[in-house]
């Protein structure tokens, strides 16, 4: 079996897949290296012989996690690296190494699935969009704050905005004008994300008409799903690209 890791700025997403058919056996999201080791150590009847990961953390943080995994589970993790080209996709950044690896693998994975022009929107701590044409050329993309960043900035810099996560969840049940602070903030931020997503569609249509695929991924994908009815919601899109970047025999 294979342990796959997507090490983001805030969380580590993990899953264990079968080596022969890539079926997902187990998975989850944790907030720290220690929590990851605890979860993996407590899995019943599950062992893995290989590990591959993508990380947007610092080199030191990534090396520390690789060392912990090697010492604890006797595996040799393979790490995704920046590339100018992968699986038919050409990196569109002027300095290809500066493109976030999670973004890179997400749209490489999307192009692999679609084999056509595609728009990829990832809604996590940050929100990103990327455009890949039918020939695999990455045309660039956009980055803006995601729901957690927008919410936390308002809570941090506006003294009278205070509410908990339970209130936040309830507030998103509807998108009518808010009659309480939590409703106003959560719904306002949600509408901003939806507006961002719709603008990406307009840009993609300017390139390709309606001849393109739309992929949405990330923890907050559900917030825009209803305004993108033709989109494919693929929570593990980064892992699709990771398998292409780090094939294991």
Curated annotation (Swiss-Prot):
Catalysed reactions, semicolon-separated: (R)-pantothenate + ATP = (R)-4'-phosphopantothenate + ADP + H(+)
Cofactor(s) needed by this chain: NH4(+); K(+)
Name of the protein this chain belongs to: Type III pantothenate kinase
HAMAP family in UniProt: Pantothen_kinase_3 (MF_01274)
Domain of life: Bacteria
Enzyme class: transferase
Record-listed substrate binding positions: 93, 100-103, 181
UniProt record similarity statement: Belongs to the type III pantothenate kinase family.
The species this protein was found in: Pseudomonas savastanoi pv. phaseolicola (strain 1448A / Race 6) (Pseudomonas syringae pv. phaseolicola (strain 1448A / Race 6))
Gene Ontology biological-process annotations: coenzyme A biosynthetic process
SUPFAM superfamilies noted in UniProt: Actin-like ATPase domain
